[in-house]
């Protein structure tokens, strides 16, 4: 215990956004020090037993869909929570070590991890135990919408109601925040991954071709749009896939309209969650939100025109936060500082 405390003196306090698609780590006075895909490549023996970790993060993501039989590239997080405990722990261990690469001692940091608002107690305990197993000496949990709101510079400590929509890789969190607490929250298991899956299904159905996750993600980023207005440029992209009928590679052209048609269902799920939040929040908070608007955070906020879609469907102004991808990790870092100043009970529902 004493040795762990001594190691702690040589470790940074970390805010970790442990996401389905990416893991970000924020360090006080240094900012975002790590932004890596939440992917681990593992070596297996002939019966499928784990032998060793082959790669983590960017290097492992490059292996998705390209590995030999002896190596499997997996995502240990699903829908914002742990799907593979052992691999998540190894991934966290690797990332924490990366952040402390100059240290001569094994790191033992104080860690704050951001969790989905809809995570169960069992899922929260798994995240906490995984962080401790990865070397953390002390672990705090904070709900992602609260961290996102702090990172987006919303006035979370005042009585004014602030609404945040955090669209991550696995989940979309919709929350109303006031007086350092979440007064309304809902979490739908729809995010960037669902958009990618919808594009893969659409290509298979419409063009009879198979594409992988990395290609679907590239399509979404390059020509994807949540709403097409009159006068908008219709982007096109040549896509290479594997034709099912011919059993050979084939190229075809996709447009922004195709992508919009493909992702319509997950978009409808996010719109429905936002409408429900506006219907169910307290009248005074609703008035604040209609006056001040809703704030979009997370990687999903980068999907072209998603702010326009949500504004048109809800009748409320929508603002995309500055640097939406890092809002949760940065907000978690600020939350750690608030805990130091006011104690762990400042976010009584989360910590």
Swiss-Prot record:
NCBIfam families: mreB, PRK13927.1. Gene3D superfamilies: 3.30.420.40. Forms membrane-associated dynamic filaments that are essential for cell shape determination. Acts by regulating cell wall synthesis and cell elongation, and thus cell shape. A feedback loop between cell geometry and MreB localization may maintain elongated cell shape by targeting cell wall growth to regions of negative cell wall curvature. It comes from Haemophilus influenzae (strain ATCC 51907 / DSM 11121 / KW20 / Rd). Forms polymers. This is Cell shape-determining protein MreB. InterPro entries: ATPase_NBD, MreB, MreB_MamK-like. The keyword Repeat does not apply. Disulfide bonds: none annotated. SUPFAM superfamilies: Actin-like ATPase domain (SSF53067). ATP binds at residues 20-22, 169-171, 217-220, 299-302. It comes from the Bacteria.
């Amino acid at each position: 215990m004493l040795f762990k405390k001594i190691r702690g003196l040589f470790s940074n306090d970390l805010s970790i956004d442990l996401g389905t698609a990416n893991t970000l780590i924020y360090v006080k006075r240094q900012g975002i020090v790590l932004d890596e895909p939440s992917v681990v490549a593992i070596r297996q023996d002939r019966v499928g037993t784990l032998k060793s970790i082959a790669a983590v993060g960017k290097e492992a993501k490059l292996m998705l869909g390209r590995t030999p039989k002896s190596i499997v590239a997996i995502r240990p997080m699903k829908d914002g929570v742990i799907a593979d405990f052992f691999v998540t722990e190894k991934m966290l261990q690797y990332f924490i070590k990366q952040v402390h690469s100059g240290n001569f001692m094994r790191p033992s940091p104080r860690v704050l991890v951001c969790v989905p608002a809809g995570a169960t107690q069992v899922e929260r305990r798994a995240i906490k135990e995984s962080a401790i197993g990865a070397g953390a000496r002390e672990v705090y949990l904070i709900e992602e919408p609260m961290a996102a709101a702090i990172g987006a510079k919303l006035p979370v400590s005042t009585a004014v109601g602030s609404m945040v929509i955090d669209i991550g890789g696995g989940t979309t969190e919709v929350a109303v925040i006031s007086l350092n607490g979440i007064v309304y929250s809902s979490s739908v298991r729809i995010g960037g991954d669902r958009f990618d899956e919808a594009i893969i299904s659409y290509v298979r159905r419409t063009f009879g071709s198979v594409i992988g996750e990395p290609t679907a993600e590239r399509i979404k980023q390059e020509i994807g749009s949540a709403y097409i207005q009159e006068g908008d440029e219709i982007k096109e992209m040549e896509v290479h896939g594997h034709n099912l009928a011919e059993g050979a590679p084939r190229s075809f052209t996709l447009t922004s309209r195709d992508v919009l048609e493909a992702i319509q269902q997950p978009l409808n799920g996010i719109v429905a969650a936002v409408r429900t939040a506006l219907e169910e929040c307290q009248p005074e908070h609703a008035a604040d939100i209609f006056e001040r608007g809703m704030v979009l955070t997370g990687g999903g906020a980068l999907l072209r025109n998603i702010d326009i879609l949500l504004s048109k469907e809800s009748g409320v102004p929508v603002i995309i936060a500055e640097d939406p991808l890092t809002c949760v990790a940065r907000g978690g870092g600020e939350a750690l500082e608030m805990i130091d100043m006011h104690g762990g009970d400042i976010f009584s529902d989360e910590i």
